[in-house]
């Protein structure tokens, strides 16, 4: 069985990780390729009240059920389909729904902390860090969380100052040293994206 190529894409919140991941997906649209978001593996908090959920630090490694992600990645590597959880950002907990992911040749794993856990890093063939200026990221995050995730401006700013920014410097930025490639400014860095896609193509063609 052909080994699944696993690509980790990380960086700070709103750094452009998803855009870089989608650029890879589009480049290899004729291949069996898929993307899994680490956000899907936020721990189930249905046992907590909504107010308690809003106080969770979602940028801390303990907010994620990374063991579950690792287990499902291994299942996919063995050629077995998995049911991936869906996270509800508005309710701050895991949805009761899942989606079916079949085995693929190329799997992108995207999220702010996908390089933080050594066990997860060890599953990856290519590790990418998207490096974007803090000011750009906070502006993007405000727009995204208000428009797409039903958040208020005050809640976004409070979360950024109390959790997002300090967690970035404590947990996310240090993982840059594990990256094989660092892409400044995300998908707008076409040279960086081209280098990545060229490397992926060479591996697939071996």
From Swiss-Prot:
Pfam families: PRK
Record-linked Gene3D superfamilies: P-loop containing nucleotide triphosphate hydrolases
Entry EC no(s): 2.7.1.48
Enzyme type, top EC level: transferase
SUPFAM superfamilies with a match to the protein in the record: P-loop containing nucleoside triphosphate hydrolases
Record localization: Cytoplasm
Entries under InterPro entries matching the protein: P-loop_NTPase (IPR027417), PRK/URK (IPR006083), Uridine_kinase (IPR026008), Uridine_kinase-like (IPR000764)
GO biological process, one term: CTP salvage
GO cellular component terms, A-Z: cytoplasm
GO molecular function, one term: cytidine kinase activity
CDD domains: UMPK
UniProtKB keywords: ATP-binding, Cytoplasm, Kinase, Nucleotide-binding, Transferase
Reactions listed under catalytic activity: uridine + ATP = UMP + ADP + H(+); cytidine + ATP = CMP + ADP + H(+)
KW Nucleus (keyword) present: no
Binding site residues for ATP: 11-18
Major localisation: cytoplasm
PANTHER family: URIDINE KINASE
Family the UniProt entry places it in: Belongs to the uridine kinase family.
Stated name of the protein: Uridine kinase
Organism in which the protein naturally occurs: Lactococcus lactis subsp. cremoris (strain MG1363)
The gene coding this protein: udk
């Amino acid at each position: 069985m052909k080994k699944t190529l696993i690509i980790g894409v990380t960086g700070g919140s709103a750094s452009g990780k998803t855009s870089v991941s989608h650029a890879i997906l589009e480049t290899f649209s004729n291949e069996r390729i898929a993307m899994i978001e680490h956000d899907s593996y936020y721990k189930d908090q249905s046992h907590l009240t909504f107010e308690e959920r809003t106080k969770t630090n979602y940028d801390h490694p303990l907010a994620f059920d990374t063991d579950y992600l690792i287990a499902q990645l291994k299942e996919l590597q063995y050629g077995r389909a998995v049911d991936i959880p869906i996270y509800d950002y508005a309710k701050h907990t895991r949805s009761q729904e899942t989606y079916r992911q079949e085995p693929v040749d190329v799997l992108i794993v995207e999220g702010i902390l996908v390089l933080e856990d050594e066990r997860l890093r060890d599953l990856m063939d290519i590790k990418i860090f998207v490096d974007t200026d803090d000011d750009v990221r906070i502006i993007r995050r405000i727009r995204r969380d208000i428009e797409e995730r039903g958040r208020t401006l005050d809640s976004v700013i409070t979360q950024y100052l109390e959790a997002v920014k300090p967690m970035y410097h404590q947990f996310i930025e240090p993982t840059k040293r594990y990256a094989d490639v660092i892409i400044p400014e995300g998908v707008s860095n076409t040279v960086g994206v081209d280098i990545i896609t060229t490397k992926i193509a060479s591996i697939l063609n071996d």
